[in-house]
Each structure stands twice: as structure tokens, then as C-alpha cells.
Regions:
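Bacterial N-terminal signal peptides that target proteins for export
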Residues: 1-9
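Short boundary/loop segments of OB/S1/cold-shock single-stranded nucleic-acid-binding domains
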Residues: 22-36
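Short nucleic-acid-contacting surface segments enriched for D/E, G, S/T with interspersed K/R
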Residues: 79-96
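Conserved hydrophobic positions within beta-strands
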Residues: 40-42
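OB-fold/S1-family single-stranded nucleic acid-binding modules
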Residues: 101-124
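Short, structured beta-strand/loop micro-motifs enriched in basic residues and often containing a Trp
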Residues: 72-80
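Short aromatic-glycine-enriched beta-strand elements
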Residues: 48-59
Length: 128
């Protein structure tokens, strides 16, 4: 009986130890609550697990190129929303709306992407 209790207690403690960091991984505290919109040129779309990665260039107010990145949701969620690895391609001109990193880094939590043709690739529909 003591062995069963010890195994149960160890399992619960392990779950609690791992649970906190995994929830923090999916938190958005690192991003500002203020929305911004940037004009960007897509450099690369990595349609990979566990999260799709988007790399793009943005011209700052001085006209200099800044290299930005964003992490989207899982590829299977985007696929259910109609996305494929070919939805966006390098060189595409896109408008990105979302919340930027609080630390001033060139990272953004994307809420919507608008293509040069005006097509809206909303992530709200995919995530809801």
C-alpha cells in the first residue's frame, strides 16, 4: 500500500513540476497588449511541429531592414483552417497585425495577415 501511495505522490509531483512550464510556454505575457500593424516581406515559412515559424523583414522608420519572427499555432490547426506550406511564399508582401514583444525584440504574436491581394488570413478563426 505504501508503494502505491509513493508512486501516486511521485506522479502528482512530476505532473505539477512539468505542468507549470508547459502552461507558461503557451502564455502570452511576453507580448504587449497594444496592437500594431507592420508591412513586411516574407523570408521563410516553416510549416513544422510543434509550431509554424514565420520569418519576415520589416523596414523601420529609418528605412533600415529589421529581421522579425513569429511563432504561429501547430501546423495541423492551420491546416484545418485551410493553410498549407504554400499559403505564403518567400518574397510575398504581407501586412501583419498583432502584439509585439514587450522586451523590444523583433517578435510578434500574429492575429491577422493580409496578403498583397487583400486576402485576410485571420488566425482568430483558426484558434477559436
Amino acid at each position: 500500500m505504501r508503494t502505491k501511495i509513493a508512486v501516486f505522490a511521485t506522479t502528482v509531483l512530476a505532473a505539477l513540476a512539468v505542468g507549470g512550464p508547459s502552461l507558461a510556454h503557451h502564455g502570452f505575457a511576453a507580448y504587449s497588449s497594444e496592437s500594431v500593424t507592420v508591412q513586411a516581406t516574407l523570408i521563410e515559412l516553416r510549416f513544422v511541429n510543434p509550431h509554424v515559424q514565420l520569418y519576415f523583414d520589416v523596414k523601420n522608420t529609418d528605412g533600415e531592414l529589421e529581421h522579425w519572427q513569429a511563432e504561429l499555432t501547430a501546423p495541423n490547426k492551420l491546416a484545418r483552417g485551410g493553410w498549407t506550406q504554400h499559403t505564403l511564399k518567400p518574397g510575398d508582401q504581407i501586412q501583419i497585425s498583432g502584439q509585439v514583444a514587450r522586451n523590444g525584440g523583433h517578435s510578434i504574436r500574429i492575429r491577422e495577415i493580409v496578403t498583397a491581394t487583400g486576402e485576410s488570413l485571420s488566425l482568430r478563426e483558426v484558434l477559436d
